Curated annotation (Swiss-Prot):
This is Shikimate kinase. Its main location: cytoplasm. Catalyzes the specific phosphorylation of the 3-hydroxyl group of shikimic acid using ATP as a cosubstrate. Keywords: Amino-acid biosynthesis, Aromatic amino acid biosynthesis, ATP-binding, Cytoplasm, Kinase, Magnesium, Metal-binding, Nucleotide-binding, Transferase. Monomer. GO terms for cellular component: cytosol. Belongs to the shikimate kinase family. Its EC number is 2.7.1.71. It is found in: Cytoplasm. InterPro entries: P-loop_NTPase, Shikimate/glucono_kinase, Shikimate_kinase/TSH1, Shikimate_kinase_CS. It comes from the Bacteria. ATP binds at G14, A15, G16, K17, S18, C19, R120. The gene is aroK. It comes from Xanthomonas axonopodis pv. citri (strain 306).
Amino acid sequence: MNPAPNLVMVGPMGAGKSCIGRRLAERFGLEFVDVDQAIVEQVGSSIPAIFEQHGEARFRQHEAETLQALLEQDNKLISTGGGAVLDPRNRERICARGFVVYLHVSVPAQLTRLARDRNRPLLQRADREQVLHAMAAHRTPLYHQVADLSLETDHLSPAEATAQLVLRLAAQWRMSSNPA
């Protein structure tokens, strides 16, 4: 089984962290928690409302506090927000308390997947493609920094991505529990 207390999903918005994460949690008997959804429940406001009323910095503070509290527990599959890796403390905590899966998605695939999504405050502008490219340039190295395992999701359905991850995670965890 998982050598870390939790399984943590990282990656950009639209990569499939929540959808695939729910499936993996069910498959491995873990409790699924979406950090953004946990923030919404705790604060009582939507993510766009938090950004509008309090700004991104306050949202990132909520994100760090929520992530820390979740990582102090065990047997969770934690789906992080795309920007969670921006905070060095989050990266440190994620690595210390989780086996980290990085779901990668290209900007063209993100644009397709997020075309009708109005719940992404950082994308509520005309230059969505440029914003996504800038985010990818800044965040991709951070995702790689924390990842124990990576999967490209551009051409995979959630079911296909889940099936691949189940096989790869099981193999990885077997190797971790049986050192040579």
